[in-house]
């Protein structure tokens, strides 16, 4: 029960972060908002790590892979923050939910895992769901929708690398290095895009980092009490929080096509999660 509560709390915290990012995107560059997410997350995470978990931290056995992982997540964050600056939170997140499908599709190549016909069918059906949301040929495809889809693709590869690192590196170190890599890279472009924030905007930028930090902390705590495969279906609670925030604060509500695509993608993701759990039990 603890695992479920922590997991659901994470999927409440992270959409709040997205809401702040969407609000700020009306006045600040997407890259600056992304910088705030990384800078303040690292600022809050560093002291916690070294005060309470320093004895568990040792240098990575795969530093190059850690760098690639951090770079991929940074790209995913930029794509997502750009997408929500243009389209609704719910539509952007729905398209980003293709991430588990990417993991399943590429795990035979990068992780050496065997994927059966049933899971391949679920992957194909899930991608059909993403096409239902985008509706190519029926409506004009905008860059924001493609960026949201790109978020899911990049996040899928991020999850694959996370699995590879889980066998060698401490997850707390992985979390810290991911933030540091992203913060260093995004800071390099700040002199070229920086817009001076107001005091209110500074507080919201800090809030993005705080909610990101708390959200990921809850995720780590949830994984302490239960396997990721068992918790995977609860991640779709994030879309409910996103819809509520989008409707209440931005007057955005998903259309019928988005709901249909979401339904298809979520069912595919849950089916894949259940099949993976069954396969592990058989082994």
Say what each PLM segment does.
Residues 118-134, 257-276:
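Hydrophobic transmembrane alpha-helices of multi-pass small-molecule transport proteins
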Residues 22, 30, 138-197, 283:
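Transmembrane alpha-helical segments that form core, pore/gating elements
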Residues 99-121, 193, 240-259:
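C-terminal transmembrane-helix exit sites in multi-pass transporters
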């Amino acid at each position: 029960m603890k695992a479920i509560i922590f997991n659901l709390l994470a999927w409440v915290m992270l959409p709040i972060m997205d809401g702040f990012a969407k609000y700020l995107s009306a006045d600040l560059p997407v890259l600056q908002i992304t910088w705030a997410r990384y800078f303040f997350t690292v600022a809050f995470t560093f002291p916690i790590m070294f005060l309470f978990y320093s004895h568990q931290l040792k240098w990575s056995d795969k530093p190059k892979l850690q760098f690639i992982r951090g770079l991929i997540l940074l790209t995913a964050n930029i794509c997502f923050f750009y997408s929500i600056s243009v389209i609704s939170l719910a539509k952007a997140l729905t398209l980003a939910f293709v991430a588990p499908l990417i993991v399943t599709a590429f795990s035979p190549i990068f992780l050496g895992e065997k994927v059966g016909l049933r899971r391949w069918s679920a992957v194909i059906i899930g991608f059909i769901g993403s096409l239902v949301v985008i509706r190519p040929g029926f409506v004009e495809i905008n860059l924001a929708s493609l960026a949201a889809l790109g978020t899911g693709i990049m996040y899928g590869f991020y999850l694959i690398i996370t699995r590879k690192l889980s066998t060698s590196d401490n997850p707390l170190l992985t979390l810290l290095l991911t933030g540091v890599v992203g913060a260093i890279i995004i800071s390099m472009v700040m002199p070229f895009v920086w817009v001076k924030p107001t005091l209110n905007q500074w507080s919201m930028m800090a809030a993005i980092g705080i909610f990101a930090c708390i959200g990921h902390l809850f995720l780590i705590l949830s994984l302490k009490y239960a396997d990721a495969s068992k918790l995977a279906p609860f991640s779709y609670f994030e879309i409910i929080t996103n819809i509520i925030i989008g409707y209440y604060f931005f007057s955005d509500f998903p259309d019928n096509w988005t709901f249909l695509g979401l339904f298809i993608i979520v069912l595919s993701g849950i089916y894949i999660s259940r099949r993976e759990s069954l396969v592990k039990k058989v082994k």
